[in-house]
Every structure is written in C-alpha cells, then in structure tokens.
Amino acid sequence: MFRLAAVASVCLASALVAPAALAQTAEPHRTVLKTADLTGTDKEIIIALLEVPPGAFIARHTHPGEEAVYVLEGARLQMPDGKEIDRPPGQAGVNVRDVPHAGYKVVGDKTLKLLTVHIVDKGKPMTVPAP
C-alpha cells in the first residue's frame, strides 16, 4: 500500500510539473553569419539569420541604419492591432534608419526564418527598443 501511494505521489508531481516545463516562452534567435567594416565609412554590415518560433514576440524597435529582410521560411503573424497576416517565403523588405517596426507575434505552428542584412553605425547596438 505504501508503495502504491509513493508511486501515485510521483505520478501526480510529474503531471503537475511537466506542463510548466513544456510551457517555456519561445524566444527569437539571431545567428550572425558575417560582420564586416564598410570601406571608407564609419558603418558596418551585419548578415544574420533570425529564427522566430511559434509563440515568440518581436518587440517594436529601430536600427541605427538600414535593414534589408528576406523571408526564407514564412509564417503567420499577429500584428499589434490583433490582425493576422501571412509572411510568405520570398518576400523582401527594407526598414529604414530610426523608424519603429515589428511588434508582432508568430502564431500557428511554423517558425519564421529571415535573412537580414544591416548596414548600421559601427559600434552602436544593432537593435534599439522603440515605444
């Protein structure tokens, strides 16, 4: 009887802890592929892969320079106004210096994968939080 109670306690504890362990917050992950100084300027170029898994949120932000974006693998996004849009593979865009953008969450079951190219002021943070 004691053994059965002990096993039941372990099973109950596992059932209560497992969902919390699985409910970890999804986070975007940026892998810098190449960084180089631009000739004759105080700017640098940063080429990166940005992976945004389902449930992850990209806060509104700016850059101290330009950012070109190419969608490698698309996903569905929930915009700040609650509207959902598709970001298909092959789509490209440019975000200009100091203009806030993003503020979206990836919804559905696909990870958004972006190739980004930044030409930014050398030595400054690549991303600056925006209001």
Predicted regions located by residue number:
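Short acidic-glycine-tyrosine-enriched beta hairpin
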Residues: 52-53, 75, 81-99
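Short beta-strand His + acidic residue motifs that chelate non-heme Fe in jelly-roll/DSBH
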Residues: 60, 78-79, 95, 101-108
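A short, N-terminal "cap"/entry segment at the start of jelly-roll beta-barrel domains
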Residues: 2-10, 14-15, 19-46, 93-96, ...
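Extracellular/periplasmic catalytic domains that process cell-envelope and extracellular macromolecules
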Residues: 41-42, 62-63, 86, 106-111
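A short beta-loop-beta micro-motif enriched in histidine and acidic residues
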Residues: 42-43, 56-70
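Short, conserved beta-strand element in jelly-roll/cupin
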Residues: 51-52, 64-78
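Ligand-binding loop in jelly-roll beta-barrel domains
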Residues: 99-123
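Extracytoplasmic low-complexity repetitive segments enriched in small/polar residues
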Residues: 35, 54, 76-77, 92, ...
